Amino acid sequence: MKYEALLHRLKPFGITGIVYDSREAGPGKIFACIRGEHCDGHDYIDAALQRGTRVILCDHIVEKDVYQIVVKDVRAFMGELAAAICNNPDEQLLMIGITGTNGKTTSAYITRSILQAADIPCGLIGTVVYHDGLR
């Protein structure tokens, strides 16, 4: 099933985001049950439900009265679903990559400067610094 089709089926729940920390769960949030080295997100379903979550993303069917999206790989599905919830913002990005032996940082900063002068929002990711284009 495509993510957009799934979101259409979830429309009655008013989904606005997805979280994997039960303390951030609430109405409109899908709670993703991620298994970690020390904790299992499935153990926190009740806490998420108490905070108002009505949809969970898990890797097996659980005995709870909650809408369940059951997938093999919760982590991978969560990322793709989060992108779909946010209308796939990555599809609207233009990315410029600079490679080579010398001059990459200088070229990146000059390119950024030109784009900013043209009022084109621009971020920059480098070895030691990153700018998101907002701050």
Please place each PLM-identified region on the residue numbering.
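N-terminal leader/targeting and accessory segments in enzymes
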Residues: 1-80, 84
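Phosphate-binding loop of NTP-binding sites
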Residues: 77-135
